[in-house]
Amino acid sequence: GSKTAHGGKWCEGPKYDLFRVIKQETGNGGIIAEDLGIITPPVRKLLRQAAYPGMKVLQFAFDPSGDSEYLPQNYKSQNCAVYTSTHDNDTAAGWFNDLDRNTKRFVKEYLGIRKAAELPRAFIDIAWKSTADIAMTTIQELQGFGTEARINVPATVGNNWRWRTLKEDFTDENAEYLNRLTEITNRKPPVKRKNKK
């Protein structure tokens, strides 16, 4: 009966039985496991059993030590989805603006960029070039938008989920860029041909 989760408790769930039924009914079902934050050993075991792809958010990757599990060269499995950002993160440009000088230097060096304005496309490039089975980005990254285009700030109320894309954000240049990047990184799905009768 609490209004928040502070008074809640963890309860044992059906574990893999739930995912077995989902897979029986839907196949893989297009599910991506949100495996961010603190993941306990029993949850890791369940994730392995379910075999759903986990999440790799590039904004979590840039610890100047270089050993972050979110850096593309550190992915332990291709069975993951790499994101340039999510609805709960700032845009890549907004995120970069808030970094300390040392981390900014590391990000630029890692991505091979000189200017902050190059960052959103560089993020998309490394996501697409990663070994992750799935790569995702946002219209905000394609357009290079900053914090003004952020969708959600977790644990806040009032100004979330208000940002909207405009028709003019969907440009031929963006489409050509993504199409070409998808081609050169071999991420285009195979074309399904209709059988001729």
Segments from the language model and where they lie:
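Catalytic cores of glycan-processing enzymes that make or break glycosidic bonds
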Residues: 1-197
